[in-house]
Amino acid sequence: IDAHLNHLKNYNVPIVVCINKFNDDSLDDINYIKDYVKSRGYVCEVSDAYSKGGEGAIDLAKAVIKSCEEVDHFKPLVDKSDSIKNKINKLNKLVYNSEMTEYSEVAEEKLKLIDKLGLSHLPICVAKTQYSISDDPKLLGYPKDNVLHVRDLIINRGAGFITVLSGKIYTMPGLPKK
């Protein structure tokens, strides 16, 4: 949870943490998480919508409404005018907790192409493993000083963004209808 809270605080907006309660969750575990989040200075509510429907999410809804009434000073993590490489490096530092980024030869060539086509203003989406804050599925928890391996970039010109492929991640192929 620290990784997510540290990431979100960079945006300078109110944060509400939701614990999705399930029937087999222990009260001790829920209270531990809730107390930990509150000790970090964040609002934390439990949603029991899984078993109680909308009634189980009323406290969460109230907390979200209250946070929306606060003045926020949203700031994006990257500037639109940053180069794609600078955007990747900033995300790596602020989101993935690392200062080191390695680019494959293919990625370096794509970065040059993106600049040549005048597409550096596009936002980026990093495709990486869901198992870790890094691009290595074996680095669990909140690893520090890991290396983000950028192996390729995909220009999604129609959709208006660049996909950054990191580690050994593959995008989902189109599946047959049958």
Predicted regions and their residues:
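P-loop NTP-binding site
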Residues: I1-K178
